[in-house]
Amino acid sequence: MHLSRYIAVLLSASSFVSALPLQNDVISDDGSKPIDAIMATAMEHKVVNPENLDATPATPENPEDLDKRFYYTGYKRNAETPEDLDKRFYYTGYKRNAETPEDLDKRFYYTGYKRNAETPEDLDKRFYYTGYKRNAETPEDLDKRFYYTGYKRNAETPEDLDKRFYYTGYKRNAETPDDLDKRFYYTGYKRNAETPDDLDKRFYYTGYKRNAETPEDLDKRFYYTGYKRNAETPEDLDKRFYYTGYKRNAETPEDLDKRFYYTGYKRNAETPEDLDK
């Protein structure tokens, strides 16, 4: 009785042990400790989708952040040239690290990029107003280039434009310095620190005249203001004007004759005797 009972207990224990897995069949990666075979089996059958790993990043990234991140590393879309890449990012306002918005505009201007619906002329105007210039172009060159194409500063009339360029000595194409002087004289412009009288004198010496003014009118106008020709004394001035019949203001012909008689002047084809008579 006791023996049969003891045998039954042994058989029961043996069946329980045989049901357990062999623990030395599965060990950890470093070989230091066994892994439960049930857990190992579960791990072998678990399938992890890589897309699921990217589906929930630590910090969600919007499309703009994605574009920026790839732009900084130089990635581009398929069939997209480096120039296309630059253009695409320029239109969305991205910039290189340590690059100000002004630097961005300059960089794209030099490569000829422009804003949407902006003509080349609009591009030039936009950059002129902000003071950008072409390579190896001085500020004076910049002014000249824009003057020739008719651009002007804000709140500047065409007359203001002409004056500004006249003071710096610019001229129109196929226009000589004399043509420049004439054009500005007719519109009343003058040189810096030059009075209206200085202006008249300068133009008188070079023979310029006012519109609808004959050479005689020119002589009269200058005589009344006391101007004279180069290397001409006051006496020479009086003689020249006497012979042509000019007189001083508020002076009668008799006064004119008296003045010239006292100084010994005479009319052409008149002898000293005729003068005395």
From Swiss-Prot:
Record-annotated membrane-spanning stretches: none
Presence of the UniProt keyword Cell membrane in the record: no
UniProt keyword terms in alphabetical order: Signal
Post-translational modification, as annotated: AprA is processed by kexin proteases to produce 11 identical copies of the hexapeptide Phe-Tyr-Tyr-Thr-Gly-Tyr, that is further modified aprY and aprR to yield asperipin-2a. The bicyclic structure of asperipin-2a is likely synthesized by the single ustYa family oxidase aprY. The reductase aprR may be required for the final reduction to yield asperipin-2a.
Signal sequence interval, chain numbering: 1-19
Phenotype on disruption: Abolishes the production of asperipin-2a.
Disulfide bond recorded as keyword: no
Pathway: Secondary metabolite biosynthesis
Prodomain residues: 20-69, 76-88, 95-107, 114-126, 133-145, 152-164, 171-183, 190-202, 209-221, 228-240, 247-259, 266-277
Protein function: Ribosomally synthesized cyclic peptide asperipin-2a precursor; part of the gene cluster that mediates the biosynthesis of the asperipin-2a, a bicyclic peptide that possesses two macrocyclic ether rings consisting of 14- and 17-membered paracyclophans. The aprA translated product contains a 11-fold repeated peptide embedding the hexapeptide Phe-Tyr-Tyr-Thr-Gly-Tyr, that is converted into asperipin-2a. After being excised from the precursor peptide by kexin proteases, the core peptides are cyclized and modified post-translationally by enzymes encoded within the corresponding gene cluster.
Protein name in the entry: Ribosomally synthesized cyclic peptide asperipin-2a precursor aprA
Organism: Aspergillus flavus (strain ATCC 200026 / FGSC A1120 / IAM 13836 / NRRL 3357 / JCM 12722 / SRRC 167)
